[in-house]
A protein has these predicted regions:
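Terminal targeting signals and extreme-terminal segments of soluble enzymes
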Residues: 1-77, 83-142
Length: 142
């Protein structure tokens, strides 16, 4: 997997309001899909870890800053950077651009969670190792 993780999304008709501008709740759905793609690229596809390993990664914090509107048909470039890996938390930063122009960005904190007990758990060792490998300089405090 390339570091930082990058992917593209076309802004579809259903992602927009009546004016053809991106509807912000659709952005959150797209962001969730980007997260799912990141985990799959990392080797921990949600469709396998959720039913088989019994843990998931719910979002416990999300902040977004919107700088420029996007419109139907725009190709959005998503960049996901792992900033910090805690005992059970993961802080990521999303940068979303279109043709090099910033559109919005987001900081998100996800937590490893036991899906039966609904509580935070430490990252499994192999998952922690994979996440730490996503930090360009793990000794650098972000």
């Amino acid at each position: 997997m390339d570091i930082p993780f990058k992917t593209k999304r076309i802004l579809r008709f259903g992602d927009c309001d009546i004016s053809g501008t991106a509807y912000f709740p659709a952005y959150l759905d797209i962001l969730n899909n980007v997260n799912e793609e990141f985990w799959q690229a990392l080797g921990y596809a949600w469709h396998e870890t959720i039913p088989n390993a019994g843990w998931g990664t719910p979002t416990v914090h999300l902040s977004c800053d919107f700088s420029t509107p996007s419109v139907f048909g725009d190709v959005l470039d998503f960049e996901l950077r792992v900033l910090k890996v805690g005992r059970s938390s993961l802080t990521v930063r999303h940068y979303i651009t279109c043709q090099g122009e910033a559109r919005w960005d987001s900081t998100q904190v996800l937590v490893a969670s036991d899906l039966n007990k609904h509580c935070a758990i430490p990252w499994p060792d192999e998952v922690r190792k994979a996440l730490m490998a996503c930090i360009p300089n793990p000794n650098n405090d972000h």
